[in-house]
Amino acid sequence: MLGDYTTESSELPDGWSIGSIGSYCDVKSGYAFKSEWWTDVGHKVIKIANIINNSIDLDSCDNVAPENAEKASNFYVKPGDILIAMTGATTGKIGVVPYCDELIVVNQRVGRFFLGDKPLEKAPFLFSTLLYGRVSRHLQPDGTAGSAQDNLSADNIKDVAIVVPDTKVIESFNSTHQNHLKSIMLNNAEIRTLSKLQDIMLAQISGR
C-alpha cells in the first residue's frame, strides 16, 4: 500500500500517474567478459544463474582478474543494487545484492538498475514494484515486454508501465521500508555465513 492507494483502487490519487520503469531509473545490461578471462580467484562476476530467490548467490559466482574487472567499472555493484535476468528460461527474475565486502561486477545479459551511489535509498519502491504481479508478468518470457526468444532488452524493461506516485509518497515509502529491505539482506548474508560454516564442519567430519 502506498499512501491511501491499494491495488483495488480504480482511480489514481492526485499527483500520481502511469509512467514506466525508465521514469524511475535507468537500466543497462552488464559487461561482455571474454571466455578466456575467467579465473578461479579475483573479482566476482554475477551471472544469470546467480540470481536466486530474489537475492544473489555470491558463493557460486565465477571470477575475473582485477584488471579485467576494471574494464567493467560502470557495472560494479553495491549492497542494495537490484539486478534482473535478461535472457533464458528465468528471464525477468530479480535479485538484490546482499551485504558483502567483495568487489563485484555484472556480466552481460544481467541487467542493473541504476539507483545512484546509495541504492538502498531508492531500492524499496523499485523492488516492490518489480514483484507486483502486473509488472512481473510483463517481464516474464510469456509477457509482452520480451520476445519469443525469451529475451529482454534494456529498453524493453524501461518501457514497462508502472504506477508512479507523487514524489513525496515514494520518498516516504522508501524511508519506511528501507529497514525491511536491510533485514532481508542481512538475513541472506547470515545464511551465506552459516552455509560456509556448514561446509567447513562437514569437511572436517568427513576427514576424520
Q: How would you label these PLM feature ranges?
A:
Residues 35-45, 58-64, 74-77, 95-108, ...:
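Short, surface-exposed loop/turn microsegments at beta-strand edges and helix-strand junctions
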Residues 104-111, 144-171:
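A short glycine-rich beta-alpha junction/loop motif
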Residues 114-117, 127-132, 136:
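Terminal anchoring/processing modules of extracellular glycoproteins
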Residues 19-37, 49-81:
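Sequence-specific dsDNA recognition surfaces
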Residues 119-124, 167-171:
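Short, conserved charged micro-motifs
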Residues 51-64, 82-85, 89-107, 124-128, ...:
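Short, ligand-facing micro-motifs at secondary-structure edges
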Residues 1-30, 159, 163-208:
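Non-catalytic DNA-recognition/assembly elements of restriction-modification systems
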